[in-house]
Each structure stands twice: as C-alpha cells, then as structure tokens.
A protein has these predicted regions:
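Acidic/proline-rich low-complexity IDRs
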Residues: 1-2, 223
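Domain-length accessory/inserted modules outside core catalytic folds
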Residues: 57-58, 113, 117-128, 152-155, ...
Length: 228
C-alpha cells in the first residue's frame, strides 16, 4: 500500500520532479559512482551494514529495511524510483560526519538560499493542507507508521523520521486552535550537506510528504473496509 501511495505523488510535487527519461539518465551514473567505491567503506561512511557473505548493503529508510545487492546495486524491496536514486546518491556522498543535533531549514543548506527557501515556503502550504482536519492522535499514528520518534521541542509535536541512517528529518507541528489553523515545518540536521545535495534534500522532503499522505490513504481504506 505504501508503494502504491508513493506512485501517486501529490500533483504539485510531481511537477517538480523530472520525467522517467531523466531518471534513467541519472540512475546510470549514480550506480557507476558507487560501483567504484568499496562496499565496506560505503557502509562505514553511511551507517549502512555490509553483509559480505551475501554481497548486500542493508540500511533502514522510514521504518523499512532496504537491501541493496552489490555490485548490481538493485533494491529489495523495490522502492519508488526517486527514493532509489536518493539512496544511491547518499551512499556515494556520505562522508561519515556525525549527525548534528542542530536543526536547519532547507533554506539553511549550503546551496539552499533560493531553491531551499522556496521549498520551505511551498512545503508549509502542503503541510497545512495535509494537517487540516486531523486530530493530534491521528497525526501521531501516521508518523509512527513511518518509524518516527517524538522529541521535545518548541512545537506541539516534533516527529523525527530516520529517512536514512545519518539523515534524519524533523517534522514540527503546531496544532490548530481558536485563532490559527494547524501548521507544520520540515527541518534537517546541520550535518545534512555531508550526505546529500540540495536537490536530493528537496526530493527527500517530497518523498516524506508522499509517504505521509499514503499512510493517510491506507488508514482511510482500512476504516472503510472495517465498516463493510
């Protein structure tokens, strides 16, 4: 169900992603880049685990165990294609820098002044639509389904998603009250630039939003099935 939901990415964010042809053109060099690296070294720098006997790199992504065969770099289970590409870029770029507890907006990334700041603004609008009409309990359940942990913060709810081993994403939510609608913001670790580019970071945010929406759809379908 999650994969089905991911393939139906929100129309706004669909328009921001390249077409399938561009994906295929990007996939080839991404695989070539990691093929020239030692799997042991990749694991050490990225937080993945290399099972040498099986020729498999294993990591966690949003509460899902992902196994990547080496040297083919094929994925099991099969992920949405942009999710695969981001992981390949992560494995190639990771330098082992410790995760910083300091959070930043996408606009605070190395090359984020224009692209990241725009993404922050657009994502706030998308999150406001996503949160509209949902109870705090419903939001917590959706976040938990993606493996989120909850942390203390200046927000009403702060969910920390482990998108990749050294690449957490914070979702801060302020619940609706008599004066304001519910709102949310995404944040990354100050160390994020050591693992992914600005464009990849944007793709991470888009994938996370699509996964949240997919969980919402799954819960709605389950509720309807239970009523039959």
């Amino acid at each position: 169900m999650l994969q089905k939901g991911c393939e139906k990415m929100d129309s706004y964010f669909k328009d921001t992603l390249p077409h399938n042809r561009a994906f295929r053109e990007m996939l080839r060099p991404a695989k070539e880049q990691v093929k020239h690296l030692s799997p042991d070294n990749i694991a050490q720098r990225s937080g993945a685990v290399f099972h040498e006997s099986d020729g498999v790199l294993e990591l966690q992504s949003l509460n899902q165990t992902v196994r990547i065969t080496v040297p083919e770099y094929t994925f099991s289970p099969r992920l949405e294609e942009w999710h695969q590409l981001v992981i390949l870029h992560y494995l190639a770029l990771a330098d082992g820098t410790a995760i910083s507890d300091q959070v930043i907006t996408f606009g605070g990334l190395k090359d984020g002044l224009i692209r990241g700041t725009k993404f922050d603004h657009d994502m706030e609008k998308e999150l406001q639509r996503f949160l509209n009409g949902k109870t705090p309990d419903c939001i917590r359940k959706i976040c938990k389904a993606l493996g989120a942990e909850f942390a203390d913060s200046n927000a009403d709810l702060c969910a920390v998603f482990h998108f990749l081993p050294n690449y957490p994403v914070w979702l801060k939510i302020w619940f609706a009250d008599e004066e304001f609608e519910a709102s949310g913001k995404l944040y990354l670790s100050r160390s994020a630039d050591h693992y992914l580019t600005m464009e990849d970071a944007v793709t991470v945010g888009e994938i996370l939003l699509s996964k949240l929406k997919a969980q919402e759809s799954d819960k709605a379908e389950t509720s309807l099935d239970n009523r039959k």
